[in-house]
Structure formats: C-alpha cells, structure tokens
C-alpha cells in the first residue's frame, strides 16, 4: 500500500536553508527582547479545555484542536456531547497560557512581570495557501502595569527587533477598544450590536466607506445610526483624535492614546511611523483598551499586533490584573523576508569535500582546524558531478566550499 508522505493538511516541513533563516530570525527577536529586560518562559502546548473556551478568544474558540479523554468505554462516549468528550486542547495563542502561568506562579514573580514567550500554536483552520494549522508566535507581555508606559515599551521594543532584522518598511497602527465602543454606542448602536458593527468597520481598507454603509444597512441596522456612524468615520479620518470628545469618548482615554503616539514618535527618531486608526479592531474578544498592529509597506495584511487585556487574568483568580502584549507575526515576517531573498548575514558555513584516496582522519583534522577559526563545517565525499553537488549545498544555505588538499585547502565562496 502506498503511504502518504506529505505532512498533515495545514502542517509543514522545513528544508535546511529555510530552517536556517527561521532560526536566525527567532534568535534575533529573542536576543533583542532579552536585551531589553524581558524574561523567557515556556508553557505547555496542551491546556485544560475550560481555560481555552473561557478566554474570549473570539473566532479562534471555534478552531480549537480538542483532545479526547482517554480510557472511557464506547458506551460512555456515545452519551457525551462534544465538549464532554474533550478535557484538553492545543493552545491557539500564547496569551491564554501566559495568563494561567502568571496565576500559577504569581508569588514567585515580580509585581510587574515582563514575559517573553516563543512557541507553536494550533488552530483548526480550513487548510489553504497562507493559512497553517500550526505556526510560531513570538510574544512579549507586561503584566501588572496599568500605565501607558507598558504600551510604549512594547511598541518600541518590537520595533527594535524588526530594525535588528533590517526591516524598515513598517508603521504602527493604534486604536483603543474604548474609543471604538464610545463612538459606536454614541451613534445609537446597542452593546449587543457592538461586536458585529466592529467587524464591518474593520473592512474599511477592503470595501471603502460606501461598502461599510451598504453592509450595515444590509444587516438591517437602523439607517439613522448607520448615517451617524459614517459621518463620525469621515470626521475621525480627517481630524484623528481631536474630535473624539464630540462622540462621547472620555478625556482620559483620548489623553492616553495621544501620549502613547507622541512618545513613540519621539522615540522612533523618524525610523518608523505610528498613526491613530479608528477602524483598527483586532479579532480577540479579550482586548479591553489599546490595540495595535504592525503594517508592512506593500502588504495587504499585518505582520504583528497586540493590545491590552486587563480582564483575562481575573477570570483565573477573581482579581483583575492589568496586562498588555505584542506579538510578531513570525510566519508572515519570515515569508516576506524569504520573498525579498533574505540571506543570513555573516554565515560562516562551508562544506569540506574529500576524495576517496584522502585519509579521513586528516580530513577531519582539517575540518576541526577550520571550526576553530569560527567556521561551521560539514564534511562530505566529493561527488562525480561536482557542479550539481555544489549547487545543492548553495541551495541549503552554505556560503562556500573547500576541496581538501594536504598542503593548501582553499575556501571558495559560492557568490564569487
């Protein structure tokens, strides 16, 4: 019987050259975050199902990979509902596990904890190009700080990580869920209508203002409310945060977002932009305040985002703890870098080739000599078709090669 050797749908294998880039990007991000004082932690990929389904993860709650209970008899299974069958699930993000981790270890952590976490998350998406069922996230979070200093630190630290990768064609979009709610309720919509109206407002870039108006009317919202909201959107687009007080947004909220924007502008030294965007929504239901995204020039999607989630930890311990996080979209970032023909800099990785007649001990001694000089060296027997062999190693990400000679082994770079 023929065996299917492809990865499961939505999963991927990585060849050496791509894995080299992925590891390099991850190392740069992690080292930048650690350099700015964030502490690396690790949480399990499996969580108790009640923690996952009770977390306000928005649409992601429908995409949880659930793990069936073990050891029950068939008759017991037949009498259970879907939720009864599963007691565990694979994490769909790193924020929910972090919240549980913090509650479990609160006594051992500082009052303001700066967490760094990197790991794979899992979502039962419909498999299609660009959508994976397993993908890596790189998160930094600040727990225990209710001030806007936390947002400023997250935004500037994430920007430093991107700069360390020579990514410079990006800007930060920022909004606040309280601004969204204030304006939408002021225009006459109800609390119950808020989430669905937000989903439509979020489509401005794709369908334009007239498209938003048509979709709101098609959903049978009151025409007066729709008219007020469109007028509000047009005015906010022109004046930014200056007109928000006219729509019932509290002065404290406006001052907070203005302070973040002005502080980041000063700290960015003009290397990237930050702008207020009322139509920025973000999908997670657990956000309570500021929300932000990284916009990459020329792409139709973000390469990272986050926000404040001051109510999530309270669901675990009955006490609200302020928290805010930022996640780099690792997969999108790596894919874009590869698209731009990114090469790992200063990669001293070579292949040392030898003939059958060479003494293998001498070849290994030469390899160790090169390694002592800082090279990463792989040793292979020279193929009859040398050109094809060298082309393969260049494709694997090697910077050069050397053919062993007892007197003079010369390293030759592929791109010279």
Segments and roles (model prediction):
Residues 1-92, 96, 152, 156, ...:
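TRNA-binding/sensing appendages of the translation machinery
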Residues 21-36, 47-48, 82-85, 93-107, ...:
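Positively charged, Gly/Ser-enriched RNA/tRNA-binding surfaces
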Residues 169-178, 197, 275-281:
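Short, surface-exposed recognition loops or helix-turn segments adjacent to catalytic cores
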Residues 2-15, 194-243:
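N-terminal targeting/leader regions
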């Amino acid at each position: 019987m023929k065996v299917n050797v492809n990865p499961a749908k939505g999963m991927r294998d990585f060849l050496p050259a791509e894995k080299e880039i992925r590891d390099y990007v991850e190392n740069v991000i992690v080292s930048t975050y650690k350099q700015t004082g964030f502490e690396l932690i690790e949480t399990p990929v499996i969580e108790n199902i009640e923690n996952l389904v009770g977390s306000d993860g928005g649409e992601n709650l429908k995409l949880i990979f659930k793990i069936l209970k073990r050891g029950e008899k068939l008759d017991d299974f037949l009498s259970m509902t879907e939720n009864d069958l599963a007691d565990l699930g694979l994490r769909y993000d790193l924020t929910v596990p972090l919240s549980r981790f913090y509650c479990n270890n609160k006594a051992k952590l500082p009052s303001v904890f700066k967490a760094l976490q990197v790991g794979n998350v899992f979502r039962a998406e419909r498999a299609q190009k660009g959508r994976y069922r397993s993908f890596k996230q790189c998160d930094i979070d600040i727990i225990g700080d209710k001030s806007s200093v936390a947002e400023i630190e997250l935004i500037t630290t994430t920007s430093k990580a991107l700069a360390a990768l020579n990514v410079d064609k990006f800007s930060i979009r920022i909004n606040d869920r309280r601004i969204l709610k204030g304006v939408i309720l002021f225009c006459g919509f109800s609390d119950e209508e808020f989430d669905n109206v937000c989903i439509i407002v979020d489509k401005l870039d794709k369908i334009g203002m007239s498209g938003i108006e048509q979709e709101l009317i098609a959903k049978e919202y009151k025409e007066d409310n729709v008219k007020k909201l469109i007028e509000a959107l047009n005015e906010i687009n022109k004046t930014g945060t200056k007109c928000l007080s006219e729509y019932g947004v509290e002065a404290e909220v406006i001052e907070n977002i203005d302070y973040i924007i002005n502080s980041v502008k000063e700290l960015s030294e003009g290397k990237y932009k930050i702008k207020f965007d009322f139509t920025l929504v973000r999908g997670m239901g657990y956000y309570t305040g500021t929300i932000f995204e990284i916009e990459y020039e020329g792409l139709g999607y973000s390469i990272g985002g986050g926000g404040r989630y001051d109510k999530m930890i309270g669901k675990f311990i009955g006490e609200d703890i302020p928290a805010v996080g930022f996640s780099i979209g690792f997969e999108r970032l790596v894919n874009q870098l590869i698209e731009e023909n990114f090469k790992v800099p200063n990669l001293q990785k070579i292949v040392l080739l030898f003939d059958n007649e060479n003494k293998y001990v001498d070849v290994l001694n030469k390899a160790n000599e090169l390694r002592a000089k800082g090279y990463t060296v792989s040793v292979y027997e020279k193929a009859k078709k040398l050109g094809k062999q060298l082309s393969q190693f260049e494709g694997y990400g090697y910077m050069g090669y050397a053919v062993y000679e007892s007197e003079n082994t010369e390293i030759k770079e592929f791109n010279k």
